[in-house]
Amino acid sequence: VYRTYPQAKMLCICDMPISQQEQVAAYLGYDEKDLTFKYFGLNHFGWYTNIYNKKGEDLLPQLREDVLSGKVTGLSASQDAGKLDDYWFKTFNNVIKGFKAYPDFMPLCYLQYYYFHDEMMEQFDHEFTRADSVLAGREITVYQECKRVIETQSAKDSYLISGVHGNYIVDLASSIINDKRERFIVNVMNNGAIGNFNHDAVVEVPCYVGASGVEPVAVGYIPQFHKSLMEAQKGYEKLAVEACLEGSYDKAL
């Protein structure tokens, strides 16, 4: 989108960081809004480096200790957990598994596909993919519930909760309209936010959002391990975009 419409006013966001932050905050005994999460990465591909409370105390070392000692083995599910399938419960639990395997930083949940690639592939069913699972489950129940709400003209007692991502979008829009300059994790042009990563790459970092736009927080230099993983992922992404825009079979391959 940046390449095709460079002047477009847009924000690219994902609900996964805020979902995971709420789960972590609940485990630590805090409201998510009372914590400041330091984070860097790409969309669906990032790490938490620090978690500060309002006293300026970093809570990530304690979380790391709890993970390594076996005190915590998984994260609780999000607000509408009652309607989530086993995939999400396993995914949330794999956050802790990934953190234990690589304890420098806490990974975003989707890193399960990169940290545990062989294991995930062994569990993959070519005859019934994740997309098939959603179509056969979540999509049907959501449409059924929406139909019920329309027929009864009431959303009372509905199990469908806008939850984390819905509130996140509203909070972000409110920050823009009212120039609150609140902090959100957003996908933006790097432009030096991550000092040792391509400046023209889109990265996912904390930003202050207000009426005048988005101001990324300086992350600084990141470790070589995480940088290398990001470069491999970004290389694929850039080639995929170029293949699409140029109609190039070679780049797609």
Feature annotation, model-predicted:
Residues 1-24:
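Rossmann-like NAD(P)(H) cofactor-binding subdomain of soluble oxidoreductases
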